[in-house]
């Protein structure tokens, strides 16, 4: 599972001094299934919350490893909240090479797609409206949008085919 974080633009009517929200994303390496949430900051606690509440809880399959950049939300001391959450859930951690964000290309690309197809195409009335539209877009991305990297299938179709195979 590839993870990344992006600072979101201010909403219409917000001032430059207002606190910015952050978009957390996770994309499955095999199926390209997307998980995303908007959280109030880019801390280890928010990353841990994203992992447990927005990734592990709704994900129907086992997450063996997460791959992220070396940001402070993902990497730190021995008692780092995100690292502890990974450890407690039996999830390994791997990191990109320092100063090489392109080595986390899947997460970087899905953020670009989200910003182009979701955020830049709409005007949001409120943070709640933006969150609601993010949920709608993630559903569209996973169940309707064909993916070139999946030979025109959706992440849902890839997972459906995988889980309908007989167990050997």
PLM features: residue spans?
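Acidic/histidine-rich, metal-coordinating catalytic segments
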Residues: 42, 61-77, 151-156
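Residues immediately flanking
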Residues: 5, 29, 41, 70
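Short small-residue beta-strand/loop micro-motif enriched in glycine and branched aliphatics
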Residues: 33-37, 94-96, 120
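C-terminal domain-tail junction helix/linker
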Residues: 89-91, 113-168
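Mobile-element integrase/transposase regions
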Residues: 1-27, 33, 49, 61
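RNase H-like two-metal-ion nuclease catalytic core shared by retroviral integrases
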Residues: 68-70, 74, 80-86, 93-116, ...
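Active-site beta-loop-alpha junctions of metal-dependent nucleic acid enzymes
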Residues: 19-20, 36-61, 65
